[in-house]
């Protein structure tokens, strides 16, 4: 499970997820990647499920890079609890994803295999995504 080893503060405000991504919008390592088309939140279980789906299809022949890390704590009150009484403990760790952010990168296999592996992992993510290549990465979201 992905989570930070240590944080300065244990809890964080919810915040807003507006605008487009500024960082992480180009392929750095791989030849193919998954780019977010809409905003959302991704947790460590979803990242791991997408990674497993991808690596199983390519039989561990390809090199996979994960470009996101869940570093924001998400708290949740138990069911049938009255309001007040403070903020509860951390339920899970998430990362806000903005449109245009590259989530996974892949290299080491041909294009057909890479596209199929990325499609399988796209189904595990909770927001719309698209496949980008080195040639198509400059397209608008």
Curated annotation (Swiss-Prot):
Asked if RNA-binding is a keyword of the record, the answer is yes
Q: Which GO terms describe its cellular component?
A: cytosolic large ribosomal subunit
Gene Ontology molecular function terms on file: rRNA binding; structural constituent of ribosome; tRNA binding
Sorted keywords for this record are: Ribonucleoprotein, Ribosomal protein, RNA-binding, rRNA-binding, tRNA-binding
> In terms of domain of life, where is this protein from?
Bacteria
- Any single GO BP term: translation
Q: Which family does it belong to?
A: Belongs to the universal ribosomal protein uL16 family.
For this protein, the record's PANTHER family field holds: 50S/60S RIBOSOMAL PROTEIN L16, LARGE RIBOSOMAL SUBUNIT PROTEIN UL16M
Q: Can you state the subunit structure given in the record? A: Part of the 50S ribosomal subunit.
Q: What does this protein do?
A: Binds 23S rRNA and is also seen to make contacts with the A and possibly P site tRNAs.
UniProt name for this protein: Large ribosomal subunit protein uL16
């Amino acid at each position: 499970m992905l989570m930070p080893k240590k944080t300065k503060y244990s809890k964080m405000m919810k915040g807003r997820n507006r605008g487009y991504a500024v960082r992480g919008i180009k392929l750095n390592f791989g030849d193919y990647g998954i780019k977010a088309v809409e905003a959302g939140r991704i947790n460590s279980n979803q990242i791991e499920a997408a990674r497993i789906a991808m690596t199983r299809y390519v039989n561990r022949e390809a090199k996979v890079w994960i470009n996101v890390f869940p570093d924001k704590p998400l708290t949740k009150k138990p069911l049938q609890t009255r309001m007040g009484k403070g903020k509860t403990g951390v339920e899970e760790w998430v990362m806000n994803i903005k449109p245009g952010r590259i989530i996974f990168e892949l290299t080491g296999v041909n294009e057909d295999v890479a596209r199929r592996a990325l499609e399988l992992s796209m189904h595990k993510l909770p927001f719309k995504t698209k496949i980008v290549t080195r040639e198509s990465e400059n397209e608008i979201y």
